[in-house]
């Protein structure tokens, strides 16, 4: 919500260069999977509204963009699991003061609590990692911005 999606990578890089923080993890990538049944239903408008609210958690300090996918509702057992999920890409360097986002446990769990409040769903689970190890879901600190 605070970046031109067509120039996000360039804008992220300019902030990093301004603060001299060009090494390390370039972005923080996380995915929120919305539960079509218990959370809010299956409309794109609701998914977009939730995604905007979730992105606003970081938007006052970090540049962030998101995209929403609509997936078929059936898993291999024929049950509806989720129609929508959103990918969020956040600059790892704050545009306010150049502070790097650490993604430590306290930051992640504070964010998880925020998602629970926004969605009204208390069943969130979170796993995160570099993506280079075992498969991760939920929040992932990986992705290159070239």
Model-derived features: positions:
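N-terminal nicking endonuclease/strand-transfer module with a His-rich metal-binding environment
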Residues: 1-146
